[in-house]
Amino acid sequence: HHDHHAAVGGGGGGGGGA
């Protein structure tokens, strides 16, 4: 997942946040 730009709290849905 490695979504640094996405919020850590929503890491599971980081793709949507980004």
Curated annotation (Swiss-Prot):
Keywords: Secreted
Keyword Secreted appears in the UniProt entry: yes
Entry keyword Cell cycle: no
Top-level taxon: Eukaryota
Tissue occurrence: Expressed by the venom gland.
GO CC list: extracellular region
Subcellular location: Secreted
Primary localization class, coarse: secreted
Function: May serve as a metalloproteinase inhibitor during glandular storage. Their inhibition may be instantly disengaged, by dilution or physiochemical change, when venom is injected into tissue of the victim.
Any further remark recorded for this protein: Poly-His-poly-Gly peptide are encoded by two gene families: snake venom metalloprotease inhibitors and bradykinin-potentiating-C-type natriuretic peptides (BPP-CNP).
Family: Belongs to the pHpG family.
Protein name: Poly-His-poly-Gly peptide 1
Naturally occurring in which organism (per UniProt): Bothrops cotiara
